Amino acid sequence: MTVLIHVLGSDIPHHNRTVLRFFNDALAATSEHAREFMVAGKDDGLSDSCLALSVQFFPGKKSLAEAVIAKAKANRQQRFFFHGQFNPKLWLALLSGGIKPSQFFWHIWGADLYELSSGLRYKLFYPLRRLAQKRVGCVFATRGDLSFFAKTHPKVRGELLYFPTRMDPSLNTMANDRQREGKMTILVGNSGDRSNEHIAALRAVHQQFGDTVKVVVPMGYPPNNEAYIEEVRQAGLELFSEENLQVLSEKLEFDAYLTLLRQCDLGYFIFARQQGIGTLCLLIQAGIPCVLNRENPFWQDMTEQHLPVLFTTDDLNEDIVREAQRQLASVDKNTIAFFSPNYLQGWQRALAIAAGEVA
């Protein structure tokens, strides 16, 4: 049997590193189909830290796509597992037959599914991508994204799978004995990416709570984002006093980010699609409820796991937030499907499906 090849087709360092380390640490030892990778981007020490994997790096999307297409044409039995498919050339290859449906297995990350960009280039490309998506052999995604995808592609097979968020299961009970009182701290957004709609979110928080809460906005990622960070800071200062606004422009190490999250009382995410699952998981683990847009289908995954969900359209106040905290504290977090290590079973099944080992 031909060994499955995993493709990280776009240079997204943070997510690519998370996936590679997860496969190296949790999957490679038990499956030959978890070891071969083709990655767009620089090595940056990943080969040395992922010794259980065989990783081939490419300078960009185009060179990677050309190599994948060549392999697909040379051996039609070769199967590929595409993680977060942000590579237009690969979609076009699937559409044109360069890659066959039986070779193409896709794990949806969120942004690669939705059509939110307004630029002309995207408007022209989206219909082609939609046609290509009808030809995918199988998609893997959250419950909400599977539901969203099935509305336009009902004949494509879908399987539940969660992004392998870096989590320490021993911290699942860390919030149970914490007392929350006084001024609330609200986390706005999960990164500095514009898709978080930070300014709209800050206005929504202010409309609900006024200048009575402290707002923390993590914007250390992506890099070279100074102009937008300053734009968000100035908009925030028009709404909140300086002591109640904390815009973080430096990237935080994982432990520092965890510490920051534990200081919050609420997460506020206004974007209308699934994204930021990693941050949501870490907040839920810490006993911190989240506010989601009703258009964000991840609320389906949360309710399936009996987790409280607040919406941006709800009338929010401190009593409602504290009640959501109490409800969250009563949940056995060791049973949540999208937490580590529970998502591992889904990955083992996904590998078997993509490799053709199970029907």
Curated annotation (Swiss-Prot):
Protein EC: 2.4.1.325
Subcellular location field: Cell inner membrane
One CC-aspect GO term: plasma membrane
Chief location: membrane
Highest taxon of source: Bacteria
Molecular functions (GO terms): 4-acetamido-4,6-dideoxy-D-galactose transferase activity; fucosyltransferase activity
One record GO biological process: enterobacterial common antigen biosynthetic process
Catalyzed chemical reaction(s): beta-D-ManNAcA-(1->4)-alpha-D-GlcNAc-di-trans,octa-cis-undecaprenyl diphosphate + dTDP-4-acetamido-4,6-dideoxy-alpha-D-galactose = alpha-D-FucNAc4-(1->4)-beta-D-ManNAcA-(1->4)-D-GlcNAc-undecaprenyl diphosphate + dTDP + H(+)
Pathway annotation from the record: Bacterial outer membrane biogenesis; enterobacterial common antigen biosynthesis
Keyword Transcription in record: no
UniProt keyword Transferase present: yes
Keywords of this entry: Cell inner membrane, Cell membrane, Glycosyltransferase, Membrane, Transferase
Pfam families per the UniProt record, alphabetical: Glyco_transf_56
Topology within the bilayer: Peripheral membrane protein
InterPro entries in the cross-refs: WecF
Family per record: Belongs to the glycosyltransferase 56 family.
Function as written in the Swiss-Prot or TrEMBL entry: Catalyzes the synthesis of Und-PP-GlcNAc-ManNAcA-Fuc4NAc (Lipid III), the third lipid-linked intermediate involved in ECA synthesis.
Protein name, entry field: TDP-N-acetylfucosamine:lipid II N-acetylfucosaminyltransferase
Species of provenance: Escherichia coli O6:H1 (strain CFT073 / ATCC 700928 / UPEC)
Lineage start: Bacteria, Pseudomonadati, Pseudomonadota, Gammaproteobacteria, Enterobacterales
